[in-house]
Amino acid sequence: MVEDYFSEQVKKYYKDRHVIYGRCAHLTESKPIFVEQGRGMCMSRRICQRGCPLGGYFNSNSTLIPWALKTGNMTLKPNSVVHSVLYDETEQKAVGVRVIDSETKSSQDFFAKVVFVTAATLNTNLILLNSTSKRFPNGLGNDNGLLGKYIAFHNYRATINAEYEGFPQFTTEGAKPTSHYIPRFRNVYKQETDFLRGYAAGFGARPARDTNREGIGEELKSNLLKTKETGLWSVNSHMMGETIPKKSNKVTLDTEKKDKWGIPQLSIDVDYDDNDEKMIQDFFEQFSEMYTKAGFKNIRINDNKRRPGNDIHEMGGVRMGNDSQTSLLNKWNQLHECKNVFVTDGAYL
């Protein structure tokens, strides 16, 4: 209700901004293809972060791996920690992957004609950096020394909260898999700010109830149920800012520290910059204005100042480009210098 109201107000006052329902890859209805994959519908349990045994939302564990197993062409090897990609000096190509058994700590080599590295951004960088040979002493395909550099991520530091007095007769019912969403509207068609790129944002609303939380057991239950009326609506947004892939934002292998499987740990050296700080201030200014025009009160902004890495969406480190002097992958996600190795996760930014 409040989300739809906010969407209408933004549409009324702005031509370049839209409040839409967030997009998420979960199943709201069953179809034969999903049944064949072994997936069930989303049951609105709201514990998605635990993983979905029903396959209600798309992910590798409940969707891709079971589907691949059904082909008969895949062997699943649990307890396998990838150590490196194997490179043959004579054939001048990758010939397989070395893994460490997480329980016995013994190593085993698997051989293949083509290798896909898709271990999530930072681990993909780690694996390639650890894939050394006489031909590639600094990491597989790393002739130009750029492997591990130009890391980017999303900036979630900024939030804004407020209250709304409208719709006192309504409350929420049921569950939904995501919140409303405001796609990026800054610097989309032209450069209009003193910072590069832009940000998207979430938007959510819930009725606040002034409840008595004293006591335990039956006393607590009774106190919680005494208040029937809902209070003001609490509304909030969080920024999802683009960071610029910079050479100074990088990951390297630690020369001294190793994990319990003998693999070098990853040293991460990334930070915010002036562009990120300007973006945060713009978010505060723009959303304070949007909230005010929507009639929201008691507007509060917050910069949590948390370090990079506490959020999600790490990207980069294995750059894509046409020039092998300035990138590691071509437009087909192949390493320029070892074309039977493909990188197909967020590392190929």
Positions of PLM-derived features:
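Conserved redox-cofactor binding core of oxidoreductases
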Residues: 1-82, 308-310
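FAD cofactor-binding and catalytic pocket of flavoenzymes
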Residues: 101, 144-266, 274, 311-314, ...
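A glycine-rich dinucleotide-binding beta-alpha-beta segment and adjacent secondary-structure elements
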Residues: 20-23, 45, 83-86, 232-243, ...
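Glycine-rich loop(s) and the adjacent beta-strand/alpha-helix scaffold that form part
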Residues: 54, 71, 80, 84-91, ...
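Generic, well-ordered alpha-helical scaffold segments in large soluble proteins
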Residues: 5, 9, 13, 67, ...
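A short, glycine/Asx- and small/polar-enriched loop/turn
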Residues: 35-36, 88-95, 311-316
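A short acidic-Thr-Gly-centered motif at the start of a beta-strand
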Residues: 66-70, 102-109, 320, 326-336
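Flexible loop/turn segments at secondary-structure boundaries
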Residues: 27-33, 83-86, 106, 123-126, ...
